[in-house]
């Protein structure tokens, strides 16, 4: 993902790269005239202003703390950590820090989702009442990935937890989850689910529903629908092309875009833009470390609900 961010922006200079894969580090550095260093060397370099953390999840909290101690601006990919306890500890340690710390929930910056949020905030459909987020991957990841991912709720649905907080403008009070392994039995053997639905309740009675699946045969399905007191807003799928074939007995459209980088490449650029703008103008970042911890707490609540069959109160985890 570090490569993706760099390719999407011309107003920042890539100075140094650290990667456990030497070949990847050298290739990226060569493309952009950077040098390869260790992570500690990068963090301690006084000439480096900002750090992008796109490492394995179990290293995120450690790198956030180290980079914060060095007063670097930080953009860290989601999630903050696989452990909610560790993520909260990280938040406590850097809470008083003055350096910007942003968590990379790129879907907030998708132009269609951002426009939906703007329309909501402008009051175009009145009060929020019922939110539905659909997120289906075209195919499941390798089992080797599943085993280290932290599970569907922490790895996949965490995007939608953050997106629901962004759209609703507040956290839910309780979550209920149902999940099963329907796509690949090996995912179940690995201790995870590949198909899940989470229902969330809010203090004033609003409801949100998130639907996830690791498989959608027709492509990458990413939709949002929100019902308000005065109307409905929908963000639909982006298709491979806009050609519509109409016949006497059927109308055929193209399938949704298949791969997440194809769909969300613009959101990564917009996210990096927002990060740089905050750093340059000394303004608060749009997605905080606290936001990241909240999304992780929701993932933990969903996991507990699935395992116990009970609704989980979010305040018990925050």
Predicted regions, residues:
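Hydrophobic residues in well-ordered beta-strands that form the structural core
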Residues: 38, 76, 101-103, 132, ...
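Beta-loop-alpha module in the N-terminal Rossmann-like domain of NAD(P)-dependent dehydrogenases
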Residues: 34-93
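Rossmann-like dinucleotide-binding domain that binds NAD(P)(H)
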Residues: 143-207, 213-218, 290
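C-terminal helix-rich "cap/oligomerization" subdomain common to oxidoreductases
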Residues: 50-53, 203, 274-318
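NAD(P)-dinucleotide binding in Rossmann-like oxidoreductases
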Residues: 186-192, 203-270, 288
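NAD(P)-binding Rossmann-fold cofactor-contacting core
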Residues: 9-28
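A contiguous active-site-proximal alpha/beta segment in oxidoreductase catalytic domains
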Residues: 58, 81-142
């Amino acid at each position: 993902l570090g490569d993706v961010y760099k390719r999407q922006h011309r107003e920042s200079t890539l100075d140094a790269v650290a990667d456990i894969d030497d070949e990847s580090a050298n290739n990226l550095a060569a493309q952009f005239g950077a040098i390869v260093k260790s992570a500690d060397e990068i963090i301690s370099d006084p000439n480096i202003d900002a750090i992008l953390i796109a490492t394995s999840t179990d290293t995120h909290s450690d790198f956030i703390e180290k980079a914060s101690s060095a007063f670097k601006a930080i953009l860290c990919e989601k999630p903050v950590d696989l452990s909610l306890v560790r993520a909260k500890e990280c938040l406590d340690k850097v809470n008083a820090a003055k350096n910007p710390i942003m968590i990379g929930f790129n879907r907030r910056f998708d132009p269609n989702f951002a426009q939906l949020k703007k329309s909501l905030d402008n009051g175009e459909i009145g009060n929020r009442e019922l939110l539905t987020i659909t997120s289906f991957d075209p195919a499941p990841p390798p089992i080797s990935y599943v085993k280290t991912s932290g599970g569907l709720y922490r790895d996949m649905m965490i995007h939608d937890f953050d997106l629901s907080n962004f759209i609703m403008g507040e956290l839910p009070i309780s979550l209920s989850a149902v999940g099963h392994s329907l796509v690949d039995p090996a995912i179940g053997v690995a201790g995870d689910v590949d198909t899940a639905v989470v229902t969330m309740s809010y203090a004033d009675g609003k409801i949100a529903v998130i639907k996830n699946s690791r498989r959608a045969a027709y492509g990458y399905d990413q939709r949002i629908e929100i019902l308000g007191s005065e109307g409905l807003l929908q963000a639909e799928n982006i298709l491979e092309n806009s050609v519509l074939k109409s016949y006497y007995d059927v109308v055929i459209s193209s399938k949704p875009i298949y791969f997440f980088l194809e769909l969300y490449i613009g959101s990564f650029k917009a996210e990096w833009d927002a990060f740089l703008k905050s750093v340059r103008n000394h303004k608060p970042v749009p997605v905080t470390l606290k936001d990241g911890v909240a999304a992780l707490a929701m993932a933990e609540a969903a996991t507990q609900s699935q395992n116990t069959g009970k609704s989980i109160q979010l305040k018990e985890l925050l």
